[in-house]
Amino acid sequence: MKEYKSVCPYDCPDACGLILTVDDNKVTKVRGNKEHAFTRGILCPKMAHYERVIHSPKRLMTPLRRIGKKGIGPDQFTPISWDEALERIVENFNHTINTYGSESILRYSYAGTMGAVNSPAADYFFRCIGATSQDRGICSPAKQAAFKSVYGDTVAIKPQEAQHSDLIILWSLNATATDVHILHDVNVAKRNGAFVWIIDTHKTYTYDQGTHHVYVKPGSDGALALGMIHIIHRDGLEDTTFIQAYVQGYDELVRDVLPTFTPEYVSSICGVPVEIIEELAHAYAKAKAPFIRLGSGVSRYGNGAMSCRCINALPAVVGAWQHLGGGLLSSSSSSQYFNKSFMQQPNTPTPSKRMMPMILLGDLLTNPKALLEHGLEDTSGGVPVHSLYIFSSNPAITAPNQNLVRQGLMRDDLFTVVHERFFTDTCAYADIILPATSSAESDDIFNSYGHYTIAASYQAIPPVGESKSNWQVISELAQRMGLDDSFFAMTERELIEHMVRNSSKLSQDEQDAILRGDLVEVALPDNYKMDFKTPSGKIEILNPRESIPLITYTEPYGDDEPFWLIIGNDIRILDSSFCELEFDDSELMKLRMHPDDAALYNINNSDAVEIYNNRGAVRIKVYLDDTVQRGTLVTLGVWWQSQSSDAKVGINAVTASRPTDEAWGSTFYDVQVNIRKV
């Protein structure tokens, strides 16, 4: 029996430190690493039994070739050797390049693993062969764009500072399900007398952590932030000294925007009572060190970036940044501390000028001119995609506008490769399926977007079955495609060492510790919070480089349907990851609805209903819940097709491939539906 230090590989800001117990080449136990500066040995329910994922009987064990129809299931496939699988892929790539042009090949991947080696493993390879590039922002690029708009390259606040705050706002953050370790710091602050305000669209798992709760209408968060600033200015509660020294655009905000956003007007937009808006604004302004932890949900609307810009302005108005415990955490900046760009080989072949935002997968697969029609550059003139390589993602269930995505995946002239651990919904549309390793079976290095700890995670067990890591497969494909580049001959460990040793921001001791497998929390510069790295050197609530320079409220898209659909987080899964596990609940996909709304549609508790709009329809069982806001419907999790109420489509059948106002992010939450009994 032996123990290995590891890291949770999933798309979560916490990137937990793990200890894997291995016996006879099997992981028998997983526990948290108590040495981790942020996760402190605590694991979420999803990772508490990671060994069940690693050694699941559902793991794919060998490459598979489709011999039947697309979109059916595992019985349409037969096992083949790795040699045959790779040769078929190479043969198809070469045929596609010679017949249609290299931009007819598309890679689609996301955050099935967050490792700095295996997440971007295919980037350089597909650039070398001239394939269509992929803009890999689907989760929260609008939120990131908003922080950059206001704060530029300013180093993000450490999450542990929340311990020193006297007022914490968890804004659009269901921390219990998506950022559980911040709650340690929140509870330290609470024990010291801090108040915790939770602002969200519905009652979440995190409800009990709050001392105050505010429920806003979907997409209205920016208006609430402006309403708070209106009150703070009206009552003379802003920090004028800080504003004069460090804020650009406040006078313009006071003159041109704030007069409109009275508490009464904001209440009409947000649905929050005037007295609650007043109480929230005063509590925030009068706190010595208010701390906002901003989640990603608010950014998944058509106005997501602008809403986040408005929220980002709040700590500037009250001067929170100058106090220990004060500020706002959107996402951390730990990726800059080692040479992650090495995986991109930035000084070698340039990307294709045809780049597909992830949200447009269904659009491009069904319409070769889709990028041009969205005003995006496409030097190919709009050639169809004929080869699709998917890894670390399950787009048949997680991509927006699911029916359009599946229509594209069903094309007979589309050759699709899926590299996966389990037979997901996307695998049903593949021509070749390749078995993938778990994080326990490969080497990688991880940073976090929620704290500042960096750690390598080395192989603890041999690959399960014939599985290979993302990097191993890409290296072999590169060799078979005749790419004579020493980069592809490097091992995962060699890549890790190169990225760490070629960092100007890590000391020799820190580099040595990381390569030993130790956890390293990087040191931040003195007074980093007050070093505003923008062109003006100030916090830019007026950014002249933006299409709308001054922060204001813009509306979400909405639809011509009566109910906002809120797709929240289920504590048991992460997007569609962990759906491979067995759950006691026979009804995983559920809908919550306010009883008064249900009465208008003659809907009773536990009725089967259909929610629908012009993009699709989803059958689901409804449960009445008076904590749900009127005019909204709530469902949790993105479950596999086999786990949905009628085993036909998932919840993304009703979501749209419309972009956020900046950065081409997803608008998964900007969706309205109608409802009927079935």
Give the role of each language-model region:
Residues V7, V405, R411-F415, H419-F423, ...:
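Phosphate/diphosphate-binding loops
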Residues R66-P79, E84, H230, D235-V274, ...:
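N-terminal leader/propeptide and maturation segments of large enzyme subunits in energy/redox metabolism
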Residues S119-I199, G222-L226, P315-A428, T437-I445, ...:
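Extended redox/cofactor-interaction regions of prokaryotic respiratory oxidoreductases
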